[in-house]
């Protein structure tokens, strides 16, 4: 059993990161792992990854299954249209999953196969830490990315002291743009490139005013967390990972 508001939030927070790869159907869905300690929802397309954890909905017996994107989208519409927060009963066997709430029953086939080992993709040692205003970063990336290369859609972060330089260029069109933002940065001077579309999708998914971005080297993934100094311990945790784009000199 899971509350409708929690389930709806879990779907919203993860579904945008699913892949549409015909070759790897597992990535076309959202992994749901239910344990005695809580529930984890994971989505990835190999460029970005979202791991959304809830400690307030656990089960007696561990189980995991991959939920397809289309039924989840439909389910989310039903959950959102229902104004009151209600309990959703989730039942599954090897091939199907069933959601029961109010007057609705939604049955869907599960995606066959084994989900990739997503924990192996999450780098553990990330000494370079950036804390910055989410809206300011989002707006800046949007503006600068207009001048990015059409093929890579790359924006470059140059971090030094408490300054973040965001830079993009399109050599074919002979255009470039740069903006400098104030930030709180602890770590070594570094340059790292990201796909602007993936990055703005991630930033759109952060609910807090500030965000924390952890990085190690330019060829390893960056990790984004919501950041709130005053926040109490909550029952939810979200980790978003974005793969870098190789820097073109």
Q: What role is predicted for each listed range?
A:
Residues 1-249:
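Structural preference for solvent-exposed beta-strand-turn elements
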